[in-house]
Amino acid sequence: MRKVIIKENPSEEEIKELLDLAEKHGGVVTIFARCKVHYEGRAKSELGEGDRIIIIKPDGSFLIHQNKKREPVNWQPPGSKVTFKENSIISIRRRPYERLEVEIIEPYSLVVFLAEDYEELALTGSEAEMANLIFENPRVIEEGFKPIYREKPIRHGIVDVMGVDKDGNIVVLELKRRKADLHAVSQLKRYVDSLKEEYGENVRGILVAPSLTEGAKKLLEKEGLEFRKLEPPKKGNEKRSKQKTLDFFTP
């Protein structure tokens, strides 16, 4: 069987056949199409007609990209179930219940890639090393902090580190290896708001970086977020894991 199967302007029947083939053989599906998107879950949203890229992975991951920005405009996590019915691709997540439907108006192209990839990513770089340091010595954030997840997927992106504080509050850490700016604060706020929708108000957001701009500091104060100063550990400097943060800011 070919590694890559491409079908231009596929019919409804051809879309179903190729989706079934991809599911059977563990293929990655990429669809270029004009479509509408309907989401129902913790809230409801509608995305009007437009040209988009739809990606379906063997683990159930489902992503819809526009022609801008890095993040998908809509997505479902691994474990979701994908079906095709009456020219609509439907992805359902059971817990919590979320339903994402892509109504195909005009399919331009469908690609099935029978990819084989068994390697795991070996993370390197300052932010990954900052996360390692935090897991090795959570006190660099604060006494009683317990990190639980790293690179945790949520509705609006991927949280660098997520854990709980001594009072049982959820704590979201956004890590930056260089001076943090307004964008970093906005990103953290988006993650905190998303988790508050799911878990309630007991969610804290902490920006972790060597420093931050004056504008970022003001926005942190305005949004009720926090800052911890932490330098990225130098390679080979294992003693850094025992160093406690020098100062922190809590509005």
From Swiss-Prot:
Positions with biased composition (Basic and acidic residues): 230-240
Primary residence: cytoplasm
Coiled-coil residues: none
Protein name, as recorded: Endonuclease NucS
Lineage: Archaea, Methanobacteriati, Methanobacteriota, Thermococci, Thermococcales
Record keywords, A-Z: Cytoplasm, DNA-binding, Endonuclease, Hydrolase, Nuclease
Organism field: Pyrococcus abyssi (strain GE5 / Orsay)
Domain notes: Composed of two independent domains separated by a small linker. The N-terminal region contains the ssDNA binding site and the C-terminal region contains the nuclease active site.
Regulation: Activity is modulated by PCNA. PCNA increases the binding affinity of NucS towards ssDNA as well as branched DNA substrates carrying either 3' or 5' flaps. PCNA is also required for optimal loading of NucS on its substrates and to direct activity towards ss/dsDNA junction.
